[in-house]
Amino acid sequence: MAYTQTATTSALLDTVRGNNSLVNDLAKRRLYDTAVEEFNARDRRPKVNFSKVISEEQTLIATRAYPEFQITFYNTQNAVHSLAGGLRSLELEYLMMQIPYGSLTYDIGGNFASHLFKGRAYVHCCMPNLDVRDIMRHEGQKDSIELYLSRLERGGKTVPNFQKEAFDRYAELPEDAVCHNTFQTMRHQPMQQSGRVYAIALHSIYDIPADEFGAALLRKNVHTCYAAFHFSENLLLEDSYVNLDEINACFSRDGDKLTFSFASESTLNYCHSYSNILKYVCKTYFPASNREVYMKEFLVTRVNTWFCKFSRIDTFLLYKGVAHKSVDSEQFYTAMEDAWHYKKTLAMCNSERILLEDSSSVNYWFPKMRDMVIVPLFDISLETSKRTRKEVLVSKDFVFTVLNHIRTYQAKALTYANVLSFVESIRSRVIINGVTARSEWDVDKSLLQSLSMTFYLHTKLAVLKDDLLISKFSLGSKTVCQHVWDEISLAFGNAFPSVKERLLNRKLIRVAGDALEIRVPDLYVTFHDRLVTEYKASVDMPALDIRKKMEETEVMYNALSELSVLRESDKFDVDVFSQMCQSLEVDPMTAAKVIVAVMSNESGLTLTFERPTEANVALALQDQEKASEGALVVTSREVEEPSMKGSMARGELQLAGLAGDHPESSYSRNEEIESLEQFHMATADSLIRKQMSSIVYTGPIKVQQMKNFIDSLVASLSAAVSNLVKILKDTAAIDLETRQKFGVLDVASRKWLIKPTAKSHAWGVVETHARKYHVALLEYDEQGVVTCDNWRRVAVSSESVVYSDMAKLRTLRRLLRNGEPHVSSAKVVLVDGVPGCGKTKEILSRVNFDEDLILVPGKQAAEMIRRRANSSGIIVATKDNVKTVDSFMMNFGKSTRCQFKRLFIDEGLMLHTGCVNFLVTMSLCEIAYVYGDTQQIPYINRVSGFPYPAHFAKLEVDEVETRRTTLRCPADVTHYLNRRYEGFVMSTSSVKKSVSQEMVGGAAVINPISKPLHGKILTFTQSDKEALLSRGYSDVHTVHEVQGETYSDVSLVRLTPTPVSIIAGDSPHVLVALSRHTCSLKYYTVVMDPLVSIIRDLEKLSSYLLDMYKVDAGTQXQLQIDSVFKGSNLFVATPKTGDISDMQFYYDKCLPGNSTMMNNFDAVTMRLTDISLNVKDCILDMSKSVAAPKDQIKPLIPMVRTAAEMPRQTGLLENLVAMIKRNFNAPELSGIIDIENTASLVVDKFFDSYLLKEKRKPNKNVSLFSRESLNRWLEKQEQVTIGQLADFDFVDLPAVDQYRHMIKAQPKQKLDTSIQTEYPALQTIVYHSKKINAIFGPLFSELTRQLLDSVDSSRFLFFTRKTPAQIEDFFGDLDSHVPMDVLELDISKYDKSQNEFHCAVEYEIWRRLGFEDFLGEVWKQGHRKTTLKDYTAGIKTCIWYQRKSGDVTTFIGNTVIIAACLASMLPMEKIIKGAFCGDDSLLYFPKGCEFPDVQHSANLMWNFEAKLFKKQYGYFCGRYVIHHDRGCIVYYDPLKLISKLGAKHIKDWEHLEEFRRSLCDVAVSLNNCAYYTQLDDAVWEVHKTAPPGSFVYKSLVKYLSDKVLFRSLFIDGSSC
């Protein structure tokens, strides 16, 4: 046995040393296979031969610019501008790669010989001879073809097969291959062509006028054009000469003449129009007709060449919806027509529309211009004294760095020489991380003198302006204005400053002042400003009488007080509301009371917008007498209704539901409408020129919902008719090949100008020869639509709802009583069921078909219910008792049965709530069961802009029943359902894991041949559905269409790369998509989205957790778990399994590459190699540069490989590097701060936020410095410390500004991969002598005790000497069902960033707690300018402020500073829980709280490099805080635990045992595995590569709990 163990160990060591030949051979084989795979992948790329002779640098440029190709460089042909010429072939191939192979392509100005050699018979080259060079170039191409053919003939070869078709075409029909007309006049007509047409323009777009380009493309029916051209951003400056260095070319500009040439070559120049090229660069839209435009989009920039594409856009696809309420209906519809035409004009015909109006777009497409500004340079002639000016591009950061610094110069120091000296120094100085560096600004040194003069002139003018501004303010006796402010101050008391500031900000008052005469010129112009030429003008500040505004403000203040009870009152725009109340003469107080009543739904009326905006509330409350003619009336009044038959006789049918110019009470049941045929030939204006909804709905909520439903039908009908009229008006410019949702029939020719996708439309819109438009009932014969003589055209729509909307409106108007809907008294029960709970099955089991009625939204669902009900062979379900909702409403009253006992509505929540109320009323039932799912897709308002308020969407019911057991969904989907539903969702399915996802390379990958999809195919959008159907997939539906359906297997596909709003974590569409299958679902997507994250989370679930959701006969047994474990953590003992390899695997997955770093000799390498250090002022004792040799005991060697470093040896170099990276590398970010006043305000906020109200004032009767406090401090000290105080007489203090410096021997491990690229500096310790600590230690211990006793411990935790159990108790009352934002503030260089302001804040906190003034001043001076001495390393230096890491206040001081920092930036009054420890913080806020720009505030006020993170789980002091529905559990970071197992400082076995015990103490919570799944989520949130880690957590528990087993993690270093 011993021999076997010895042999195993020896083999293992041989493998580690690389002596195992088998392992070495396997590694070589793996390396060889990888290399072969990589070369094979490269061989599959398109091959391009580069024959021109170019340099190695140019070879690298070409290779990097075009990674899509495998380029072979032959270097066999010398030529002029060889790189540019060779790149031209690459550019051509790149453009052709964008085009589908075989599609007809026009090459504008192209090389037809290149296409012949590639065998592209589908390309037509347009090669006009604009000058003699073009003729010469074309002849050269013909010569290359003849040379190629003669070479084949001489060798007895024939043209290869792939070229044969192209050469035959060129030989037989040369005009099909190439023509010599311009692209605008080209008349090439393809013989037979199907599919889309494309075009490319390689360096030829310059010669086509931009205004003619769109029309030329449309004449050739081009779908997309790809173009490439040379350009430089510098052409947009005032430069007349611009170099293109990479291709050795240049642009020269003279007015509008732009010349392109190659440097140092005698080739001819190319001349173009600068303004024409600028249009191609800056414009977005290129009009082609009054309907279509070509929209430009930049693709990429490669080697001074810009690539872009022009896409054909049909502006008729812009949707025109009708859902607005106007005072004058005729004016509204006229204005709507004008607005739509104006919108179309903007999209097509505005030739000055500029793409780069957005600065973010400028930065993206002009990357060299990002953060660059254009600065003027000035010069003067000595002979003529004439001043000259030019412009250069300079980094904006560089400009403000210089200006901010030289602005601090005193008047005498502000000289040109000093400015130039500073500019030259920051351009040349080298600093990186305090050690080595180079300048971050690459400014041309030849420009430094001119730039310095510009900076100097600007600063001198700015200083003069400031002096004049200050002189304008009176500093003597009080002015009249000041006396007014004093009187206001007396009235408001202490609140005056904030009131004054509020009034100034609101512009209700203004401060008078004289106009200033000095204007400092703009220092720079941004690149974006130069493009769009935007300028702003200054406005003087006039005087203003504030008395009237103060009275108005008082009125608005009272109104604001009334509005303060609203949830979002802070978002109400008071200025807009005030203006509207004033113009309409509405009392603001009355308006405020109405707003509160409407928002709380207690008023009995509803405004038809989503929330009452300021203007609409004032308009709704306008006095009736002041209203204009035709304005809506809130109160009901009797109005005589016009005759319906008379309206139809005139062709003007009134069909405005409950809307229009009449109140709802004026409508009554009208027996005149007997048939829908009476609507035939009603004018379209009568349908689309009526108001679509009332401003105010009155009555109970059900009545309001029913009124809104009628108005929604009117709006839908109006929108459909309006769109058909628009199609008839714009038919002339419609492209016949474009797929449309409409159809237009030309009556004279009996042909469809636009062929509809469907047939036999019942209704349409007719255009007569008199250009009048009517709604018509269509009839058909054997020739098609039956038409009349005066008809010109007929428009139909595949999505038209004219017939159904008219029929439903006819039915609902009959049901109105005196203009009001009748509400049934039947009991309404909502059955809320999870997906797959068997809602349809339950309906069939409960229904009595002889007396009950079933209604469903869709025809397929109705047929499915009839089929299932009649499956036994007995026909019980017929079209009389199982109907669709539309059929029931349209045919109401025609059936033999008109009354039912019970009504069952399946998927009722997909209907408008008013529709449901009407169905209950129309069925005359006693009880109605509405089956639905509150979390799935609700009713969607399809009419754009139609108001459907949020409280209308909630169905009013008498009782709610829940169904929480799914018969369909597998266990993993059931786990997801538990997040979305209240209560416990269980499943009867035996399938545990069913979901998966696959990221595809692009939409083109999805096709039936290479990617057959299994099961039912679903998409989220109609566009994706149409794309899949067009590619050959069958039976494809959207998620919305299959709600309520069940399938065994589902393939869910997303082809749209742009963001889709319905794909979100809480989207009902995602819920429906995940719950349609019983066995499997696979999600194919082209982008990462929230659904991918959800599926990945479900894939990581462990099987034992999924077993908890399985139930056989109900949910009662599962529901008992909550009452048993409420208020305490569920405990499940962790199994002790796993091996060392599990820990190593987990560490390598989380931190890849760290374990491979051989860092044992990093410290030796640093001491033996040359090093350059940038050191601040300090004194070095070079005699300490060589450390004395010490006998080192070899530590134990860990078996787990981590990034842990070997212990470092103290020495001059090591300590100096640590001091440079720590103490000398403090950031300087803060702005100008009034330290004392700001510190006082911050401390006020600190006390108000964290301390109990009754303990905010210190107890002055308690002495801080007493014998008891000294004894408490001594009890915590070691005997060695007490011995150092034996000779201290406590009469006088040692120097409090003298500190000692040392380093920790063991570097701190970082849980990232930075160890692979940098040498980690040691942590420094700066500390006082024990004599000083003996004075201040007891004091601050007592102050700390008082502070912690005063903190509101129910909401805040100051983590000092707390156990993990206490942390769990503190966070244990968090309600996991309440949405929360978990915030963490991450601050880098926390200790070293603290400056005078931090010292003032901390001192003010201790002072208010009772710190004695004299000792407080001593303590403050001891932390101001301090001297550091490192006797071991021989270093002495001076630093200002900074947190001393070995000070008595290090920990508590850091804690109160982080708490004060957060209190000054975040709304602590809203916080749920907060914890602070040193520089760590963890905050829980209610979901949706608005937070300021924390990074900005932390930089300017606190000098912190801070980032605020929102998390799902908290991370605090190396522990994950997992809150759940029963409390909270705190897990020690498992990755940090594994990192410690790789420690290389363990001396011996006794030390190892102490190490194990300490790890056991901190990791005790890992013994509970009940919440390992949540721990996985928390770890993955920090480390995105972390796999599910339950296996490694169990392994850690196994080794930590066994003393003997733990020793196997290390081997004795002395035996190696």
Swiss-Prot record:
GO terms for molecular function: ATP binding; ATP hydrolysis activity; mRNA methyltransferase activity; RNA binding; RNA helicase activity; RNA-directed RNA polymerase activity. Residues 72-281 form the Alphavirus-like MT domain. Residues 830-1085 are annotated as: Helicase. Residues 964-1116 form the (+)RNA virus helicase C-terminal domain. It catalyses: RNA(n) + a ribonucleoside 5'-triphosphate = RNA(n+1) + diphosphate; ATP + H2O = ADP + phosphate + H(+). ATP binds at residues 833-840. Gene3D superfamilies: 3.30.450.420, P-loop containing nucleotide triphosphate hydrolases. Its EC number is 2.1.1.-, 2.7.7.-, 2.7.7.48, 3.6.4.13. One of its GO terms (biological process) is DNA-templated transcription. CDD domains: Virgaviridae_RdRp. Keywords: ATP-binding, Helicase, Host-virus interaction, Hydrolase, Inhibition of host innate immune response by virus, Nucleotide-binding, Nucleotidyltransferase, RNA suppression of termination, RNA-directed RNA polymerase, Suppressor of RNA silencing, Transferase, Viral immunoevasion, Viral RNA replication. Residues 1380-1493 form the RdRp catalytic domain. Residues 50-458 are annotated as: Methyltransferase. Residues 801-963 form the (+)RNA virus helicase ATP-binding domain. Heterodimer of a large and a small subunit. Belongs to the ssRNA positive-strand viruses RNA-directed RNA polymerase family. This protein is translated as a fusion protein by episodic readthrough of a termination codon. When readthrough of the amber terminator codon TAG occurs between the codons for Gln-1116 and Gln-1118, this results in the addition of the RdRp region to the replicase. This is Replicase large subunit. It comes from Tobacco mosaic virus (strain Korean NC 82).
